[in-house]
Structure formats: structure tokens, C-alpha cells
Regions:
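Amphipathic alpha-helical segments typified by the pilin-like N-terminal helix
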Residues: 2-50
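Periplasmic/extracellular, small/polar-rich flexible segments of pilin-like filament-forming proteins
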Residues: 57-157
Length: 157
């Protein structure tokens, strides 16, 4: 008498395993997309806050002892007292100490000069107002469900 001792899985068992793996992968992709969206939003908020703090601290240094605005020892800097236009030109130029990248467009700089229009997501647009001695920082943060606008105004005096 022959015994048929087949070892292995049936087609149904294999299909069930493939279906389970597919369902888990679908859940993982959705969770990962949510994670990356939240990371971009948090990174953009952090970049906005860091730029505002950097400019405010450099302006405070200017008011104390009239040191050049910018990184110590840099060839390109702004002499104090600085006008909003010269500060924004310096910070958005090639020699800018601000090296952050836009989280939504990885190779683009996170800081740019603006004239008051809408800001593309992830980009901190600095708008100088020489008559009011202020710099306005505008940043747009968005995901699939909402769009938030951050705006901060600091005085250069």
C-alpha cells in the first residue's frame, strides 16, 4: 500500500497568506503617508521658528554692540544698524547662513524674499518693510486635509 505523504501548502492557503500580506501592506502605506505628511508639517514649523529666532537674535546683537549681521568671519555680512531690505537680501542670497531646505521640495532653499504674495508650502517668505522697520515671515503648511499659514512680524529697530 502506497502512502501519499504530500508536504506543502494548498493553493487556498497560499492565496489567504497573499491576501493577508496585501492587506497589511495597504495599511502600512497609508500609515507611512500620514507619517511623512506630519513630518513635513513639523519640519516646516521648526524651520519658520528657527529663522525668526535667528533674525531676532542677530538684530539683538546689532543693538548691543553693532557687530556685522551674519556669521562671524563671513565675507558677506550686513553692517548694523540694518534695514529690513538689506537683511532679507543677505539672508536669501548665495552667502546666506540659512541653509535649510524646503521640506516639500527637497532641493529648494527654505527661505526666499517676497513682495507680500501667497507663499508656496514649506517656503519661508521674508517680506521687508523699510518704512515700518519690520520683516514679515510667511509660511504655508499643508497636507491632504488642511492648510495653515504662519505669519510672524519682527521689528529691526
Amino acid at each position: 500500500m502506497k502512502r501519499n505523504n504530500n508536504k506543502g501548502f494548498t493553493l487556498i492557503e497560499l492565496l489567504v497568506v497573499v491576501a493577508i500580506i496585501g492587506a497589511l501592506a495597504a495599511v502600512g502605506v497609508v500609515a507611512y503617508n500620514g507619517y511623512t505628511s506630519a513630518a513635513k508639517k513639523n519640519s516646516t514649523k521648526s524651520i519658520h521658528a528657527n529663522m525668526v529666532k535667528y533674525v531676532a537674535s542677530e538684530l539683538a546683537k546689532c543693538s548691543i554692540d553693532a557687530q556685522p549681521f551674519g556669521t562671524a568671519g563671513e565675507s558677506a555680512s550686513v553692517e548694523c544698524p540694518a534695514t529690513p531690505s538689506t537683511v532679507v537680501s543677505f539672508l536669501t542670497g548665495d552667502d546666506s547662513p540659512l541653509q535649510d531646505k524646503d521640506p516639500y521640495q527637497g532641493d529648494a532653499a527654505a527661505a526666499s524674499a517676497g513682495g507680500g504674495g501667497g507663499s508656496p508650502e514649506g517656503n519661508v517668505i521674508m517680506t521687508p518693510d523699510d518704512s515700518a522697520s519690520t520683516i514679515t515671515f510667511n509660511t504655508q503648511i499643508s497636507d491632504a486635509t488642511s492648510t495653515d499659514d504662519l505669519e510672524t512680524v519682527i521689528s529691526t529697530e
